C-alpha cells in the first residue's frame, strides 16, 4: 500500500500495530496500562457503574439511582476491578486523568475494546510477528 510517495508494507503495519498494543499495555509516557488489572499500574477510578458501586456482599441493600452519585464522585478507588477493560486513555497531550467522572478517558466501551481484541488475536496467531 502507498501513502503519498511512501510505500507501506505489511511489516510496517504489523510493527505499528505492535507499538500501539504495547502503548495501551504500559509502554507509554505515563508507564500505565490502560487495560484495567494489567501490569503494576492501571486506572483505579473506572467510569463503570458495576465497578464503582459496592458489591452486593459488601452492601446487601439496594442502592437507589440518586444514591449512586456519592460513588461516582468518590475519590476512593473502585471496589470492583473491571479486569481486562480498556479505557478511553490519554488525551492528545498524553495526559490521563484517573477520574471516574471524566468518562472520555475513564470509560470502557465496545468501540474501544473491540479493535484491541483483533490486534491481540493476530499476535496470538502469529507469534513470529511479535
From Swiss-Prot:
SUPFAM superfamilies listed in its UniProt record: Six-hairpin glycosidases (SSF48208)
Cysteine-cysteine disulfides: none
Catalytic activity as recorded in UniProt: Endohydrolysis of (1->4)-beta-D-glucosidic linkages in cellulose, lichenin and cereal beta-D-glucans
Keyword annotations of the record: Carbohydrate metabolism, Cellulose degradation, Fruit ripening, Glycosidase, Hydrolase, Polysaccharide degradation
Active site: residue positions: 47, 98, 107
InterPro entries xref list: 6-hairpin_glycosidase_sf, 6hp_glycosidase-like_sf, Glyco_hydro_9, Glyco_hydro_9_Asp/Glu_AS, Glyco_hydro_9_His_AS
Entry EC number(s): 3.2.1.4
Family from the record: Belongs to the glycosyl hydrolase 9 (cellulase E) family.
Protein name: Endoglucanase 2
